[in-house]
């Protein structure tokens, strides 16, 4: 995974290309081993993925943290955020599962959930699709130039 510190109006982020059950399992293990408890999670994927095998991992990774589900833009294979949010919400109890039209909106929404103290242990996680990460870097190219932590 890649850490991006809070800057330019973005919350502290942890990015990972986990886009299948194997990748999500590895991501889950890595964040658990690092003692990371997400403040919020942004997840999206393509419609041709077998989402049923991915759902348990996303639910465990998010835990009680708010889960924001944008629709990946400019990709006809993208899964609709509202459909995906409905699937992810099942079994999450009162935890927030919120579809958003765009990644930029999800990033704004998640910032308010990051604690003022100990933000390094409570970043916003962004995962589920390499296309989602590509969209993030298109929106925020300056993050590619930052010194990575």
Indicate residue ranges for each PLM-predicted region:
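C-terminal helical cap/extension that packs against the catalytic core
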Residues: 10-13, 55-123
């Amino acid at each position: 995974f890649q850490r991006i510190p809070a800057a330019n109006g973005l919350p502290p982020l942890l990015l990972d290309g986990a886009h299948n059950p194997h990748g999500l399992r590895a991501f889950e293990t890595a964040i658990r081993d690092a003692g990371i408890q997400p403040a919020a999670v942004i997840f999206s994927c393509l419609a041709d993925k077998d989402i049923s095998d991915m759902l348990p991992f996303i639910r465990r990774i998010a835990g009680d943290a708010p889960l924001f589900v944008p629709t990946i833009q400019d990709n006809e294979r993208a899964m609709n955020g509202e459909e995906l949010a409905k699937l992810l919400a099942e079994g999450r109890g009162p935890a927030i599962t919120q579809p958003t039209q765009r990644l930029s909106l999800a990033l704004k929404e998640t910032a308010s959930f990051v604690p003022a103290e100990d933000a390094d242990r409570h970043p916003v996680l962004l995962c589920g699709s390499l296309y989602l990460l590509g969209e993030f870097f298109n929106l925020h190219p300056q993050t590619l130039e930052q010194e990575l932590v």
